[in-house]
Each structure stands twice: as C-alpha cells, then as structure tokens.
Amino acid sequence: MNKNIVIKSMAALAILTSVTGINAAVVEETQQIANAEKNVTQVKDTNNFPYNGVVSFKDATGFVIGKNTIITNKHVSKDYKVGDRITAHPNGDKGNGGIYKIKSISDYPGDEDISVMNIEEQAVERGPKGFNFNENVQAFNFAKDAKVDDKIKVIGYPLPAQNSFKQFESTGTIKRIKDNILNFDAYIEPGNSGSPVLNSNNEVIGVVYGGIGKIGSEYNGAVYFTPQIKDFIQKHIEQ
C-alpha cells in the first residue's frame, strides 16, 4: 500500500481517537511515522553532547558557543532585555539547570539575523546540579568551512509549547551557500529559529533563521558563519 495513504489514514484515525480518548498510543505512533518521513527524531537524553549545547527559549532555540554565551537570532533576542530571566539550558525544564539572568545582548551589525547573548553564570533559581550555567551545558566549536551536499543536522525546539519543550533533531544536506546565507533541506518548524546547523563532527556551521516547513524544501535558511561573523561572535564570548 502507498505509504502516503497509510500516513493519511493513520492521521485521520489519530484525530478521531484524540476526540474520543480511545487510544492515545495511536496518536503517538502516527506522530512517530510522520516524523520519520521528515527525518526528524526526538532527543530522549539531552545530557550528552551535542544535545546539551542546545538551549530553549519560550518560543525559539539557542546554542552555547562559549562561557556564559549563547547564540540565537535577532528576531528572538528582540523580545528580551538585560535583566530578564530565561531557562537557558537543555530541554526547557527549569529544574534541569536553573533560571538565569541576561547580562548583555549584542546584535550583529549587518543584516544577518544573529544575536549573541551573555548570561549570569550563577542561576537565580537553583536546579538539581547547582547554580553554575557552565556545568549544565557544553559549548560548540566552529566548523572550518562547509560545502554543498555536506550532511548536516539541526537540533532545536520546534513548536515548543505544542511539543512540551521537547528537543528534536532533523537531518539533511546543504543545498546552497552564497555569501552569508546557507540553504538546506533538513525539516524545520517555528521554534527552530536560533538552532545550530551542525556538520558530521558536530561543529557549528551556522544558525537557523527561517524556513517554509515543507518536507524536502531546499529553501530553509541559516546564516552561514563566515570568518567575519566568527570574529564578531568570538569578540563577544565571555573570557
């Protein structure tokens, strides 16, 4: 039987069971099949690298690039100000590593959608591992370069409220690199803004800024980390 027919049939059944409460397991299985079609998997353990380097915001994603330093998008950081409290650690659960205050926000001076956020090292609310941000996360290293057809992964928090701040990983390939823009076909959704684009060595190539949420789309976009952008980020990493 055609796989698309099977998926659509199960999706219809899932809608029915969600209303009647007959079988919640069918809903979960349907979601798993749909995610498999998109090359998307849920991350079950965020305590290990690279997953412990990807942090959640209320409606987006960020990732750790150095001591007390997070990269996200300008369109994400614009909703925050110095002194705001964020759950900046893996999996979006404040009990996982504490809640932290923003110390500074530095937007890239060009048109590229990059923002560097520095946070206080000590949590204002304590998590089970203590107050220190850097004990709960691991920073990424920059990739030297990237090229078309390289395999990549995107890790983040798509549809965070709907998915209860669960972390997901999607895989794909680079389709185009032009100046500071990188296009790829890994599946993304709202909430993936600020996600790292990683190579096969889990080195960061760029930061996701937008997409069209379509399977196989080659128009999902990230800011490609050129030497100039890397220099800007490096200058804002806390020493």
UniProtKB/Swiss-Prot annotation:
SUPFAM superfamilies reported in the protein's UniProt record: Trypsin-like serine proteases
Signal sequence segment: 1-36
Top enzyme class: hydrolase
Single GO MF descriptor: serine-type endopeptidase activity
PROSITE patterns: V8_HIS
Enzyme Commission number(s) from the entry: 3.4.21.-
Name of a matching Pfam family: Trypsin
Keywords associated with the record: Hydrolase, Protease, Secreted, Serine protease, Signal
BP terms from Gene Ontology: proteolysis
Any one GO CC term of the record: extracellular region
Catalytic residues as annotated in Swiss-Prot or TrEMBL: H75 (charge relay system), D113 (charge relay system), S193 (charge relay system)
Subcellular location: Secreted
Protein family membership: Belongs to the peptidase S1B family.
Classification via PANTHER family: PROTEASE DO-LIKE 5, CHLOROPLASTIC, SERINE ENDOPROTEASE DEGS
Protein name in the entry: Serine protease SplC
Organism: Staphylococcus aureus
Gene symbol of the encoding locus: splC
